[in-house]
């Protein structure tokens, strides 16, 4: 247990260090996911629950044994059970986390840092999603460990409605990034125009 405390302390002590050069995960990590492909939707049935959100997301992962997407997937699979933020924005938070993790990490000491800042258009199913004008400031730490590995993650997501033109949130279902999205069990609706495109509904 003291060993784990030392690791956590080590991760936090190095937070303020100057970021190193941008680096991609090892080539032999077959779970590395490239950025998802965006497919604009020209028409969406019912615009009642569609809103533009300016989002900022940051995921900081502390993994003393090196970068491992297998552990990130484990954390994301159990995300619904540990999420402590606004339940009306749970789906939005998962999308932002997924987008951040699908990008290139920046190493900071023992940490890998992923960031995303975008304007996205979300559509929720009837009576779901955030209230009109509702904003989100979400921050949480999630840890996972077994006999051989300890991983700590810090998640920060902020979202507010904005009127800047955004892109419909959707992904190409043929992309390898879907390995990550499917783990998060997002409720989606298939586009009539493009069978490879889905829209967030939860």
Curated annotation (Swiss-Prot):
Gene3D superfamilies: Rhabdovirus matrix protein M2
An annotated Gene Ontology molecular function: structural constituent of virion
Pfam family, one: Rhabdo_M2
Domain of life the protein comes from: Viruses
GO CC annotations on file: host cell endomembrane system; membrane; viral envelope; virion membrane
GO biological process: one example: viral budding via host ESCRT complex
UniProt keyword annotations, A-Z: Apoptosis, Host membrane, Host-virus interaction, Membrane, Viral budding, Viral budding via the host ESCRT complexes, Viral envelope protein, Viral matrix protein, Viral release from host cell, Virion
This protein's record includes keyword Membrane: yes
Cysteine-cysteine disulfides: none
Span(s) of short sequence motif PPXY motif: 35-38
Topology within the bilayer: Peripheral membrane protein
UniProt-annotated location(s): Virion membrane; Host endomembrane system
Location (main, coarse): virion
Keyword flag Membrane: yes
Further comment found in the protein's record: Most abundant protein in the virion.
Family: Belongs to the lyssavirus matrix protein family.
General function of this protein: Plays a major role in assembly and budding of virion. Completely covers the ribonucleoprotein coil and keep it in condensed bullet-shaped form. Inhibits viral transcription and stimulates replication. Plays a major role in early induction of TRAIL-mediated apoptosis in infected neurons.
Subunit composition and interactions: Homomultimer. Interacts with nucleoprotein and with the cytoplasmic domain of glycoprotein.
Domain observations: Late-budding domains (L domains) are short sequence motifs essential for viral particle budding. They recruit proteins of the host ESCRT machinery (Endosomal Sorting Complex Required for Transport) or ESCRT-associated proteins. Matrix protein contains one L domain: a PPXY motif which potentially interacts with the WW domain 3 of NEDD4 E3 ubiquitin ligase (Potential).
Full protein name: Matrix protein
Organism expressing this protein natively: European bat lyssavirus 2 (strain Human/Scotland/RV1333/2002)
Name of the gene: M
């Amino acid at each position: 247990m003291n060993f784990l405390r030392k690791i956590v302390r080590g991760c936090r002590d190095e937070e303020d260090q100057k970021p190193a050069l941008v680096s991609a995960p090892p080539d032999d990590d077959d779970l590395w996911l490239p950025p998802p492909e965006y497919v604009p939707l020209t028409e969406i049935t019912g615009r009642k629950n569609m809103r533009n959100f300016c989002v900022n997301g940051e995921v900081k992962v502390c993994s003393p044994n090196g970068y491992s997407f297998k552990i990130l997937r484990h954390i994301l699979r159990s995300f619904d059970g540990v999420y402590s933020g606004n339940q009306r924005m749970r789906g939005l938070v998962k999308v932002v986390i997924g987008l951040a993790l699908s990008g290139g990490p920046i190493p900071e000491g023992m940490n890998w840092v992923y960031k995303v800042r975008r304007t996205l258009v979300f559509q929720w199913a009837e009576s779901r999603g955030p209230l009109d004008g509702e904003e989100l400031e979400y921050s949480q730490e999630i840890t996972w460990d077994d006999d051989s590995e300890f991983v700590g993650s810090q998640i920060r997501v902020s979202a507010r409605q904005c009127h800047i033109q955004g892109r419909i949130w959707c992904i190409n279902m043929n992309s390898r990034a879907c390995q990550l999205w499917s783990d998060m069990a997002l409720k989606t609706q298939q586009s009539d125009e493009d069978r490879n495109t889905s829209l967030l509904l939860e």
